[in-house]
């Protein structure tokens, strides 16, 4: 590698480190290979990383999660795509101090973020609405894992999920580590986006969060997936052009009608 190549590589590393401030050198190396066309190993990136004084900012203590490395806390393990989904709520505020909620849905096997629905208020009817849209696009999963929040344990939600052929998997109360996949996703969302972003409107939040979700699925290297993104074939990001949706799995022939909630 000549001097000019070394300088260009260094510039690309610095730019990616600036753009993705929570990524370490291994994720940056994976991005260099997958999106920038570099043929470079982790050791060279690490050497430049250290020479330039780059580092991942220390996490705030409140981001810590209880998690067992062997996964022994997770009683139901996903064995194939659409086997187990998990979902959970995350709350944040726009610049004016008003609260909004996000309903996050993740496929535990592929690690793909299937949906992030954002609204000022999200109730059990919205849970059914989100799942209905996803079932049509993706098919019905075997199980849906969640905590015991009122929106998830609502009778209408349980009956509707059962009617379409899926099963609910509720974690023990006060045991968020049993929902480790979605908890980890929520932590990444906060760490990589929400903690450093100010949204002046709900519309802005929806646009930026959706952009982050697509990046998370199609570009972001995942250590647990060998530093590859979970779903590069779903959306192909093109600079300056709108991403083109790719074929989805066959939709179920029919879904149970949505219940009328009062």
How would you label these PLM feature ranges?
Residues 2-4, 146-160, 168-191, 201-210, ...:
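RNase H-like two-metal-ion nuclease catalytic core shared by retroviral integrases
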Residues 33, 50, 54, 162, ...:
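Residue-level detection of the helix-turn-helix DNA-binding "recognition helix"
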Residues 164, 187-262:
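C-terminal domain-tail junction helix/linker
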Residues 1-84, 175, 229-240:
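Basic, flexible linker segments flanking DNA-binding modules
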Residues 13, 28, 45, 49, ...:
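Mobile genetic element proteins and their domesticated derivatives, centered on retroelements
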Residues 56, 167-168:
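Hydrophobic beta-strand scaffold residues
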Residues 38-106, 112, 125-130, 137-142, ...:
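Mobile-element integrase/transposase regions
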């Amino acid at each position: 590698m000549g001097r000019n190549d070394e300088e260009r590589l260094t510039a690309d590393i610095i730019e990616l480190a600036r753009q993705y401030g929570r990524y370490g050198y291994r994720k940056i190396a994976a991005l260099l290979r997958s999106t920038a066309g570099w043929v470079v190993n982790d050791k060279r990136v690490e050497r430049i990383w250290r020479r330039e004084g780059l580092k991942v900012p220390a996490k705030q203590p409140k981001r810590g999660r209880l998690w067992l490395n062997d996964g022994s806390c997770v009683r139901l393990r996903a064995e194939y795509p659409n086997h187990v989904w998990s979902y959970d709520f995350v709350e944040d505020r726009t610049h004016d101090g008003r609260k909004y909620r996000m309903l996050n849905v993740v496929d535990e096997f592929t690690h793909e973020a299937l949906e992030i629905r954002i609204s000022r208020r999200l109730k059990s009817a919205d849970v059914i609405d989100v799942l209905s849209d996803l079932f049509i696009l993706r098919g019905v999963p075997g199980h849906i894992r969640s905590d015991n929040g009122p929106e998830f344990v609502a009778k209408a939600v349980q009956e509707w999920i059962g009617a379409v052929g899926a099963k609910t998997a509720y974690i023990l109360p006060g045991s968020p580590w049993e929902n480790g996949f979605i908890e980890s996703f929520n932590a990444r969302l906060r760490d990589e986006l929400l903690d450093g972003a100010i949204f002046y409107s709900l519309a802005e939040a929806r646009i930026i969060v959706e952009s982050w979700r697509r990046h998370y699925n199609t570009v972001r290297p995942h250590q647990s997936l060998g530093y590859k993104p979970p779903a590069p074939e779903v959306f192909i990001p093109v600079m300056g052009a709108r991403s083109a949706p790719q074929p989805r799995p066959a939709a179920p022939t029919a879904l149970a009608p949505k219940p009328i909630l009062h």
